[in-house]
Amino acid sequence: MMGYQTNSNFSMFFSSENDDQNHHNYDPYNNFSSSTSVDCTLSLGTPSTRLDDHHRFSSANSNNISGDFYIHGGNAKTSSYKKGGVAHSLPRRCASCDTTSTPLWRNGPKGPKSLCNACGIRFKKEERRATARNLTISGGGSSAAEVPVENSYNGGGNYYSHHHHHYASSSPSWAHQNTQRVPYFSPVPEMEYPYVDNVTASSFMSWN
């Protein structure tokens, strides 16, 4: 029994001695470095990790954009992206001829800058003609005979209102002469010479 205990004690002592030797020879840094290599920057949030995160975020955005570009058939104009917070607007069209190119946009019946240059000029002309017709109808019409004409003889005024007076004042003197009785020869010899009243006797009977 004693020999067994001695052997057991010896074995226990030997094992404990080996444990102490292993404990003194244990280096946690060497064992940790030999088992695996760990980058300490992953847990500290250093610039290198932030740069990696930014690179991954940029890669994800580029993949999404390329996917959307593929879905829209490669047509960048039909995409619904917003630049600067403003969506792409449709090109302006003329309300009359549906053109999209013009040197100048003009106001029309549908609002400001709703007509192209040519349609805007035509619309303005028609608007002026309609306004002139309305003024003519409301004013009872106008004619050239009603327009006053400057009379150089009377120093102004309406020519038609003073025309009769001007004609009377500028007529020749023989028009105001009294009628005179002028004898003429009768075909019957026994009859007396009759007399006729003639205003213009002095002009065409100068032989008398």
From Swiss-Prot:
GO terms for cellular component: nucleus. The keyword 4Fe-4S does not apply. Keywords: DNA-binding, Metal-binding, Nucleus, Transcription, Transcription regulation, Zinc, Zinc-finger. It is found in: Nucleus. A zinc finger (GATA-type) spans 94-119. One of its GO terms (molecular function) is DNA-binding transcription factor activity. The keyword Metal-binding applies. It holds the Pfam family GATA. Belongs to the type IV zinc-finger family. Class B subfamily. Transcriptional regulator that specifically binds 5'-GATA-3' or 5'-GAT-3' motifs within gene promoters. This is GATA transcription factor 20. It comes from Arabidopsis thaliana (Mouse-ear cress). The lineage of its organism: Eukaryota, Viridiplantae, Streptophyta, Embryophyta, Tracheophyta. The gene is GATA20.
